[in-house]
């Protein structure tokens, strides 16, 4: 997308126009209402389960606690939204990898327009549905079995049905927020789930500081300072762009001669935004969930022990977790950059518009230049994201403050990233409303 030098509205102008735009108010109300609905649904219980005993077991298991944060406490409350949006995110990862690997799916996404994208979305829903059943069955048989009041085929059926229906409903809410509300539905749901667990985490941190004396207070303050520096760094990465100058050739329309003008092609330092972090976290959560489902399930035999060993190796704070997490961030950063910006398509579009990059020949040379710039930007962005994501792990180990369960960095990255992306969407909507108003003026 080529942009000119038009000045973006300030934050004050944005919020002033938000108050005046009925359409934006409606979108915000829809988004807030749907998010509240999902939070309420978390506390609708699955029947015939000793929830108090199960919740205590979850609190004592840091591996499942890692998964519980991303469901906003839905797993510990054993609600119908126990799996939350995670099956849909896992399905999206699978579908995007398949799209990149299978030419027919890639052609469907790129060349079939809106109809093709709808088919891809439909395939993602089918995968999410199957994934819900698998995870629901694993949750019921592996985790909930010791806490069931009347365990049997009927209990398994009704529990899997309730959890699957709940997760599919959350998926529908996510798509509804994306289409009718403000922001990305899946990202906002994870954002709200993390925010919901923050009071408990902060309370535990304050309790740790109060009980440990001056040394503990110093450790907590140091950790908070690291988080503050991280916020500044995250904003820098999310907002950082490389502006490539674009020169449009002179052209004559009728008797008017339009002179050569310069605009810019902005390439973000972090093209994928917060999605590489969310997807990397979802991949790392998968072994934890499989280990939780395998615990106490004798039917899995040796596989259950393998799942547990993999989960222990990928426990937050271990060197294996740090390395795998960084590799996943790199992979999804490059993967998302390739999906969002296609140098070949950009080069062709510039050539069609009669535009070019100064000093670069149109066509293949422009494509190679853009590809090189994009790769360098993505590499720098991925390094910074990996550093920011793993730094608090070492700080926690040095200070002894482990109340964030190794998820503080990931949570902070998601919270700040989603907040920035949502604010940008609101600003874009305000700008579009401004131009629509100018066009409608007589």
Swiss-Prot record:
PROSITE patterns for this protein: SECY_1 (PS00755), SECY_2 (PS00756)
GO cellular component terms, semicolon-separated: cell envelope Sec protein transport complex; plasma membrane; plasma membrane-derived thylakoid membrane
An annotated Gene Ontology molecular function: signal sequence binding
Protein localization: Cell inner membrane; Cellular thylakoid membrane
Entry's transmembrane regions: 29-49, 69-89, 126-146, 153-173, 182-202, 217-237, 274-294, 320-340, 377-397, 400-420
Keywords from the named record: Cell inner membrane, Cell membrane, Membrane, Protein transport, Thylakoid, Translocation, Transmembrane, Transmembrane helix, Transport
Membrane association type: Multi-pass membrane protein
GO biological process, one term: protein transport by the Sec complex
Function: The central subunit of the protein translocation channel SecYEG. Consists of two halves formed by TMs 1-5 and 6-10. These two domains form a lateral gate at the front which open onto the bilayer between TMs 2 and 7, and are clamped together by SecE at the back. The channel is closed by both a pore ring composed of hydrophobic SecY resides and a short helix (helix 2A) on the extracellular side of the membrane which forms a plug. The plug probably moves laterally to allow the channel to open. The ring and the pore may move independently.
PANTHER family reported in the protein's UniProt record: SECY/SEC61-ALPHA FAMILY MEMBER (PTHR10906)
Subunit structure: Component of the Sec protein translocase complex. Heterotrimer consisting of SecY, SecE and SecG subunits. The heterotrimers can form oligomers, although 1 heterotrimer is thought to be able to translocate proteins. Interacts with the ribosome. Interacts with SecDF, and other proteins may be involved. Interacts with SecA.
Family membership: Belongs to the SecY/SEC61-alpha family.
Protein name: Protein translocase subunit SecY
Lineage: Bacteria, Bacillati, Cyanobacteriota, Cyanophyceae, Synechococcales
Gene name of the record: secY
